[in-house]
């Protein structure tokens, strides 16, 4: 039986973007949520709002603790989930987690409260303007 691993994607990239990586790990059974924070789970004030999405997935899909791997935003969400429910995790591998100072977190909270975070956060701007349709694979490879 294959070792089970859960993967949490980075902000702005659905989990399927990592399929080439997953294909290189055939010895593992890799589970994931395609788009964290969509559907009935939403970020209202903090990334911690998505912990129930992770824990609900684990409870529905795993009968024992699993290794979890998170990239960027996904790493942070998994850390919050592991903090709240360590019983669900064998361990956690965090790839490139964003670590934000108190000043930055405070500024982000104020901008969210004022409803201007999409206008002033560079990553949010890039994600909102990212194309999802391209003329060819060759075109994408040049980017």
PLM feature segments, named:
Residues 70-74, 78:
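Gly/Ala-rich beta-loop-alpha elbow adjacent to hydrolase catalytic centers
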Residues 127-143:
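Conserved alpha/beta-hydrolase catalytic His-Asp/Glu region
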Residues 2, 27, 62-64, 87:
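Active-site acidic short loop of glycosyltransferases
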Residues 2-42:
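Conserved HGGG/HGGXW glycine-rich cap/lid loop of the alpha/beta-hydrolase fold
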Residues 4, 65-67, 91:
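Structural motif
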Residues 47, 83, 91-132:
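Flexible "cap/lid" loop of the alpha/beta hydrolase fold
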Residues 32-69, 105, 110-111:
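Active-site loop/oxyanion-hole signature of alpha/beta-hydrolase fold enzymes
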Residues 20, 80-84:
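Active-site signature of alpha/beta-hydrolase-fold catalytic machinery across serine-
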């Amino acid at each position: 039986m294959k070792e089970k691993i859960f993967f949490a994607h980075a902000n702005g990239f659905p989990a399927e973007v990592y399929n080439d990586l997953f294909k290189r790990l055939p010895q593992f059974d890799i589970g994931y949520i395609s788009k964290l924070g969509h559907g009935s789970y939403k970020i209202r004030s903090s990334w911690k709002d998505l912990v129930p999405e992770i824990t609900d997935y684990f409870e529905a899909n795993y009968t024992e603790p699993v290794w979890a791997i998170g990239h960027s935003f996904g790493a942070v969400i998994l850390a919050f989930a592991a903090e709240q429910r360590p019983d669900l995790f064998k361990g956690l591998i965090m790839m490139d987690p964003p670590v934000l100072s108190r000043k930055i977190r405070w500024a982000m909270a104020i901008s969210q409260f004022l409803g201007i975070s999409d206008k002033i956060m560079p990553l949010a701007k890039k994600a909102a303007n990212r194309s999802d349709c391209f003329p060819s694979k060759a075109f994408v490879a040049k980017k």
